[in-house]
UniProtKB/Swiss-Prot annotation:
One of its GO terms (biological process) is L-proline biosynthetic process. Its main location: cytoplasm. This is Gamma-glutamyl phosphate reductase. It is found in: Cytoplasm. Catalyzes the NADPH-dependent reduction of L-glutamate 5-phosphate into L-glutamate 5-semialdehyde and phosphate. The product spontaneously undergoes cyclization to form 1-pyrroline-5-carboxylate. Keywords: Amino-acid biosynthesis, Cytoplasm, NADP, Oxidoreductase, Proline biosynthesis. It comes from Escherichia coli O7:K1 (strain IAI39 / ExPEC). It catalyses: L-glutamate 5-semialdehyde + phosphate + NADP(+) = L-glutamyl 5-phosphate + NADPH + H(+). InterPro entries: Ald_DH/histidinol_DH, Ald_DH_C, Ald_DH_N, Aldehyde_DH_dom, G-glutamylP_reductase_CS, Glu-5-SA_DH, GPR_dom. Belongs to the gamma-glutamyl phosphate reductase family.
Length: 417
C-alpha cells in the first residue's frame, strides 16, 4: 500500500512543481471553499473520533487538540485562504552573478518534492500541512494519530475532490488511514519517495524517527517553555504575560510550563502570582523556596517533582522555581529546556540582551508571551511544524522551509578553461 502511495506522490510532485503561483492559489481557494461546503461531513466524523477518544480515557488536553467545532473548521478554511495571500518562494532567485568565464549563475528556490508528516490528535494539521505543501509545489503523505482517523479520512477526501476538480492528481495529498503502527516504521524507510519527514508528536515519536528513519527528519514541537521573571520586572505587566502564556490555550506547544522567579522579587511577586493563578484555575508546582510562600495564598499548590521540570504539561499546571539570578535561570533552561520558546520579563536591557544571546532556543522573547511562536503570528501563514533543531529550518516552519534550491548556470556554449 505505502509503495503505491509513494509512487503516486512522487508522480504528483512533478506536476505540482510546474504550477504557477496563480494556479496553486486557485487550488487552495477551491480547497477552502470545499472545506466549508462539506463541513458537516468533517464535523460528523470528528464527533465520532471525539466520542471514541473520551470513552478511551483521553485527557482533556488531548480532547481539546482533537476536537473540531464549526468555528474552528471555518478558521482552518480561512487559514488556507491566508496561504493564498502569502508570497510564493518557489522560483525566487536567492543570489547569483556572472562568473569570470561568462557563465551566469543563479541559486533558485524549488520544491522539496514529497513531504511526509506523522502527527497525533491534531486534525487542523491535516489542512495546514496540505495547504503549505501545495503552495510550495510539494506532494504530501500524512499519517495522523488513530484518534483522528475518521476526521483525517473525511478531510483528505474533501481535499482530493478539490484537487481532481482542478485537474490535479489525488496523489498530491494522501493519508495513511490504517492505524497499524507497523506502517510508521515502513514509512520511515521510504527514502525512495519521501524527501523530508516531519514528526509532530511526543518525545517517543521523535526518538523513533531519529533512530529508524532513512529520510532526513525535522524534529521539534515539544515545548518545555520557560519565563524568567527578573528582579526589575514590572509585576502587574509580568502577570498579564504569564496568564496569556499559560492559560490562553494550555494544550499548545508554545505554552509556558516553568516560571523562574528571581529571589529578589519573590516576596512581592509570588503573592500576586498566587492570586492571579487562582483566578485562572492554574495549579502551581513549586520548589521548596516558593512553596513556603505560595502555601498561604489562594492558588492550589503542590511540591514540584524533579522530573516535572522536564514535563510538557499541556494543561493548567505550572512549575514555579526561585532562582538566584540570571545565570541560575539560564542554567536551568539549558538543562531542562527543549529549545522551543523562552522569555525574560525585565526592565534591565543588559539582562535582556544576555538572555537573548545565551538562551539557545528557536524563539527567545523579551517582555512578551511565548505564545507568539506560531506561523500565523510570525506572518508565515499556517505552519507545518515548529523546528527546534538547527539544520534546514528552525522555529515555525512556513513556506520557505518547505523548499530547497538548485544552482542554474546559463552560458553561451561556455566551457571550463
Amino acid at each position: 500500500m505505502l509503495e503505491q502511495m509513494g509512487i503516486a506522490a512522487k508522480q504528483a510532485s512533478y506536476k505540482l512543481a510546474q504550477l504557477s503561483s496563480r494556479e496553486k492559489n486557485r487550488v487552495l481557494e477551491k480547497i477552502a471553499d470545499e472545506l466549508e461546503a462539506q463541513s458537516e461531513i468533517i464535523l460528523n466524523a470528528n464527533a465520532q473520533d471525539v466520542a471514541d477518544a473520551r470513552a478511551n480515557g483521553l485527557s482533556e488536553a488531548m480532547l481539546d487538540r482533537l476536537a473540531l467545532t464549526p468555528a474552528r473548521l471555518k478558521g482552518i478554511a480561512d487559514d488556507v485562504r491566508q496561504v493564498c495571500n502569502l508570497a510564493d518562494p518557489v522560483g525566487r532567485v536567492i543570489d547569483g552573478g556572472v562568473l569570470d568565464s561568462g557563465l551566469r549563475l543563479e541559486r533558485r528556490r524549488v520544491p522539496l518534492g514529497v513531504i511526509g508528516v506523522i502527527y497525533e490528535a491534531r486534525p487542523n494539521v491535516t489542512v495546514d500541512v496540505a495547504s503549505l505543501c501545495l503552495k510550495t509545489g510539494n506532494a504530501v503523505i500524512l499519517r495522523g494519530g488513530k484518534e483522528t482517523c475518521r476526521t483525517n479520512a473525511a478531510t483528505v477526501a474533501v481535499i482530493q475532490d478539490a484537487l481532481k476538480s482542478c485537474g490535479l492528481p489525488a496523489g498530491a495529498v494522501q493519508a495513511i488511514d490504517n492505524p497499524d503502527r507497523a506502517l510508521v516504521s515502513e514509512m520511515l524507510r521510504m527514502d525512495k519517495y519521501i524527501d523530508m519527514l516531519i514528526p509532530r508528536g511526543g518525545a517517543g515519536l521523535h526518538k523513533l524517527c531519529r533512530e529508524q528513519s532513512t529520510i532526513p527528519v525535522i524534529t521539534g514541537g515539544i515545548g518545555v517553555c520557560h519565563i524568567y521573571v527578573d528582579e526589575s520586572a514590572e509585576i502587574a505587566e509580568a502577570l498579564k504575560v504569564i496568564v496569556n502564556a499559560k492559560t490562553q490555550r494550555p494544550s499548545t506547544c508554545n505554552t509556558v510550563e516553568t516560571l523562574l522567579v528571581n529571589k529578589n522579587i519573590a516576596d512581592s511577586f509570588l503573592p500576586a502570582l498566587s492570586k492571579q493563578m487562582a483566578e485562572s484555575g492554574v495549579t502551581l508546582h513549586a520548589d521548596a523556596a516558593a512553596l513556603a510562600q505560595l502555601q498561604t495564598g489562594p492558588a492550589k499548590v503542590v511540591a514540584v517533582k524533579a522530573e516535572e521540570y522536564d514535563d510538557e504539561f499541556l494543561s493548567l499546571d505550572l512549575n514555579v522555581k526561585i532562582v538566584s539570578d540570571l545565570d541560575d535561570a539560564i542554567a536551568h533552561i539549558r538543562e531542562h529546556g527543549t529549545q522551543h520558546s523562552d522569555a525574560i520579563l525585565t526592565r534591565d536591557m543588559r539582562n535582556a540582551q544576555r538572555f537573548v544571546n545565551e538562551v539557545d532556543s528557536s524563539a527567545v522573547y523579551v517582555n512578551a508571551s511565548t505564545r507568539f511562536t506560531d506561523g500565523g503570528q510570525f506572518g508565515l501563514g499556517a505552519e507545518v511544524a515548529v523546528s527546534t533543531q538547527k539544520l534546514h529550518a528552525r522555529g515555525p516552519m512556513g513556506l520557505e522551509a518547505l523548499t530547497t534550491y538548485k544552482w542554474i548556470g546559463i552560458g553561451d556554449y561556455t566551457i571550463r578553461a
